[in-house]
Amino acid sequence: MSPIDRRRVAQNFGRAAARYDQLSQLQREAREELLDRLTPLQLKPDRILDIGAGTGHGARELKRRFPRAEVVAIDLALPMLEQARRQQGWFRPFRRVVADAAALPLADASVDLIFSNLCVQWCPDLRQTFAEWGRVLRPGALALFSSFGLDSLQQLRQSWAAVDAHPHLIDFLHIQQIGDAALKAGLSNPVLDRDLLQRRTPDALTLMRELKQLGAGNAASERARGLTGKRALAKMQA
């Protein structure tokens, strides 16, 4: 496993904030599927956290669905939340808090629903993150999240493996590892399933550039420093 540099994660997404909404098609699809999971549930939450809220689209929809709830958008990158503030409007505002998913500035048992779309894969210690969620959740509350899985970006990973041994992507977890982390953290009755979302790009280099523009670039703490040369890029695409 390649350790994750959380400071690098915050920097990458902060730089991507202004253009994030133009490029985040996969994130939108995953968010809509996650929101659909809420539809059949008869929830009446008083406080909702959107962890890894980005530019706030999930928080806005949660506020629309639960207008009486306090919705708190949490993200590690301040520029993302600044974009959320510009876009949220005045009619159904939500709070914005810069915080780590594994160190929430909230009291114990103070949250009814945690919503988190494609965030937990950026957490260095998933068990610690889930334990923190369990701390702030009230008894019987719900955490609903999505994550990239073990098979995500495998073709790009294989392309880089032909170039060198340095980590160019963070390692994603198998669904069983995610479930085990939830159980070990003390979360009750975890239910996980797997969906396949496909995104086609002309070549590996195009995909790599899109990931970087999204803020989803290399955040492995053991990544190679410095620029990638033209020869390495050509070999990666071969």
Region spans (language model):
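Class I SAM-dependent methyltransferase Rossmann-like catalytic core
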Residues: 2-32
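Conserved alpha-helix/loop element of class I SAM-dependent methyltransferases that forms part
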Residues: 26-45, 61
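Class I SAM-dependent methyltransferase SAM/SAH-binding core
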Residues: 47-104
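A short acidic, Gly/Pro-enriched loop at the edge of an enzyme's catalytic core
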Residues: 102-113
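A short SAM/SAH-binding and catalytic strip from SAM-dependent methyltransferases
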Residues: 112-125
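A short glycine-rich, Lys/Arg-flanked "PGG" loop and its adjoining helix->strand segment in the class I
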Residues: 127-139
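Conserved catalytic/acceptor-binding region of the Class I
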Residues: 142-206, 210-230
